[in-house]
Amino acid sequence: MALFKKKNYIRINPNRAHANDASKKPSVPDNMWAKCPSCKRTLYTKEMGAEKICPHCGYSFRIGAWERLAITVDEKSFHNWDSELVTKDPLNFPGYLEKIEKMQEKTGLDEAVLTGEATIEGQAVAIGIMDANFIMGSMGTIVGEKITRLFERATEKHLPVVIFTASGGARMQEGIFSLMQMAKISAALQRHNKAGLLYLTVLTDPTTGGVTASFAMDGDIILAEPQSLIGFAGRRVIEQTIRQELPDDFQKAEFLLEHGFVDQIVPRNLLRQRLSDLLRLHSLEGWR
């Protein structure tokens, strides 16, 4: 009878089908998309290139020290200095050394600054690059020691110094030992200056606190990346102190340029060439 005739269908286990669908679901790699803090557009990260610049508004995303090094100096010209220095915990601050280890694994750096010797379009230079990804680029004893030695070696070798700043200020976990670095670096910087050698600073986002109050603003020529946050105290602290509302662009690179604190704002994709031009202009070869 037709009633008992085998029907033309197959049985589907809904749980198994769901599991198969989940296994076939494409995985999206991390860091494929980013949102621009300036124009608020969602960007495909490959659009930004190695310089990590928004193609729509020109905003420069924060980049690490190794990324910065790769787009600034000549290939295979960098020689790392003082990577053997080890961070101590003078105040026995809870969890401090564990945090240092975690940051070292995350960034591939030994501390919040990378220092060494390299060439930029064939011109020898002592270079320091701070990394805000390493405890906000805060300045502790090792950061201070590495930058001090950078200036001392540059003075001995008669090299110009280029430093890319990116910092939240002094490292609170080291207390007064951190604050001491400001004076120590400034003394080495002054000896480099008395030797008649060039010092260029590039202020990047963010450059604040004790770094701003010491070597960041002491450059013979001070460059900055567009829209970088540059200042000493925080905006809220200043407003509460002076009891006035600050302009919207206060502590931005453009505001500082307008008020004479910065010599020039240079887009990241033009920085390498601008540094090369300045180094050549201030070298002996530049006067021949």
Curated annotation (Swiss-Prot):
Belongs to the AccD/PCCB family. Pathway: Lipid metabolism; malonyl-CoA biosynthesis; malonyl-CoA from acetyl-CoA: step 1/1. Its main location: cytoplasm. The gene is accD. GO terms for biological process: fatty acid biosynthetic process; malonyl-CoA biosynthetic process. Acetyl-CoA carboxylase is a heterohexamer composed of biotin carboxyl carrier protein (AccB), biotin carboxylase (AccC) and two subunits each of ACCase subunit alpha (AccA) and ACCase subunit beta (AccD). This is Acetyl-coenzyme A carboxylase carboxyl transferase subunit beta. InterPro entries: AcCoA_carboxyl_beta, Acetyl_CoA_COase_Trfase_b_su, ClpP/crotonase-like_dom_sf, COA_CT_N. Its cofactor is Zn(2+). It catalyses: N(6)-carboxybiotinyl-L-lysyl-[protein] + acetyl-CoA = N(6)-biotinyl-L-lysyl-[protein] + malonyl-CoA. Zn(2+) binds at residues 36, 39, 54, 57. Keywords: ATP-binding, Cytoplasm, Fatty acid biosynthesis, Fatty acid metabolism, Lipid biosynthesis, Lipid metabolism, Metal-binding, Nucleotide-binding, Transferase, Zinc, Zinc-finger. Component of the acetyl coenzyme A carboxylase (ACC) complex. Biotin carboxylase (BC) catalyzes the carboxylation of biotin on its carrier protein (BCCP) and then the CO(2) group is transferred by the transcarboxylase to acetyl-CoA to form malonyl-CoA. PROSITE patterns: COA_CT_NTER. GO terms for molecular function: acetyl-CoA carboxylase activity; ATP binding; carboxyl- or carbamoyltransferase activity; zinc ion binding. A zinc finger (C4-type) spans 36-57. Its EC number is 2.1.3.15. HAMAP family: AcetylCoA_CT_beta. NCBIfam families: accD (TIGR00515). Gene3D superfamilies: 2-enoyl-CoA Hydratase, Chain A, domain 1. It comes from Enterococcus faecalis (strain ATCC 700802 / V583). Residues 32-288 form the CoA carboxyltransferase N-terminal domain.
